[in-house]
């Protein structure tokens, strides 16, 4: 029983160390610049703009439109509007 407690504490400590640090050490998304000079983030020429939300990035509801979430996705796959699996969402960075 003692081994299980020690293993549990070590697992929680490892998870805490692997968690991202708050404050100035957060990872910033690569937005690819601004869109037409209006300071709105835009995707680079090598990326496609994909709209999705949470698990909707991988499995989209048929006919669902974009809400407030937008992602830049680097992929050679075509944009599949209304498809069940969005291939572009597998390599994405969120646009703020």
UniProtKB/Swiss-Prot annotation:
Q: According to the record, what happens upon gene knockout?
A: Does not affect pathogenicity in a corn seedling infection assay nor the production of microconidia.
Keywords associated with the record: Cell wall, Disulfide bond, Secreted, Signal
Q: Which cysteines are joined by disulfide bonds?
A: 43-72, 51-66, 52-57, 73-92
**Parts forming coiled coils:** none
Q: Please list which residues make up the signal peptide.
A: 1-18
Residue stretches spanning the membrane:
none
Location of this chain's protein in the cell: Secreted; Secreted, Cell wall
Similarity comment? Belongs to the fungal hydrophobin family.
* Function (record text): Aerial growth, conidiation, and dispersal of filamentous fungi in the environment rely upon a capability of their secreting small amphipathic proteins called hydrophobins (HPBs) with low sequence identity. Class I can self-assemble into an outermost layer of rodlet bundles on aerial cell surfaces, conferring cellular hydrophobicity that supports fungal growth, development and dispersal; whereas Class II form highly ordered films at water-air interfaces through intermolecular interactions but contribute nothing to the rodlet structure.
What protein is this chain from?
Class I hydrophobin 3
């Amino acid at each position: 029983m003692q081994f299980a407690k020690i293993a549990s504490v070590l697992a929680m400590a490892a998870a805490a160390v692997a968690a991202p640090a708050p404050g100035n050490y957060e990872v910033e998304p690569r937005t690819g610049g601004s869109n037409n000079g209006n300071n709105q983030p835009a995707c680079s020429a090598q990326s496609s703009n994909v709209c999705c939300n949470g698990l909707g990035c991988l499995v989209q509801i048929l006919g669902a439109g974009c809400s407030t979430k937008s992602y830049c996705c680097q992929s050679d796959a075509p944009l599949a509007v209304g498809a069940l699996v969005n291939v572009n969402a597998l390599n994405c960075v969120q646009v703020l």
